[in-house]
Design a protein with these regions (language model features):
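Conserved "HGTGT" condensation-loop signature of ketosynthase/thiolase-family condensing enzymes
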Residues: 1-108
Length: 108
């Protein structure tokens, strides 16, 4: 999210409502900050690379999620091994740059 009190809560609740509780979630923004117009491309690459490798990055500096946020599996502290067929990249940025992309694993 945009790291605002209302934005992060609304975004996490919407994610839970659409995908259900307990879905693993992390944020690359904790690594790069606000990249504005580049956020979609960077986030898409990051998501695909994590799915390809089967290792998912934690959100840096996240120790206790806001209790008002959706009931999701917030990746904290350490990289996690996860195998998945799909990954979703959300971008909710300043100025209404909002995208959600879903990628499916392709086997050679």
């Amino acid at each position: 999210g945009t790291a605002t009190d209302r934005g992060d809560v609304a975004e996490s609740q919407a994610t839970q409502q659409v995908l259900g509780s307990g879905k693993p979630i992390s944020s690359m923004k904790s690594y790069l900050g606000h990249t504005l117009g580049a956020c979609g491309a960077i986030e898409a690459w990051w998501a695909i690379e994590m799915m390809r490798r089967g290792t998912f990055a934690p959100t840096l500096n996240l120790t206790t999620p806001d209790p008002a946020c959706g009931e999701l599996d917030y990746l904290m502290d350490a990289w996690r091994m996860l195998e998945t067929e799909y990954i979703m990249s959300n971008n909710f940025a300043f100025g209404g740059i909002n995208t959600s992309l879903i990628f499916k694993r392709i086997y050679d």
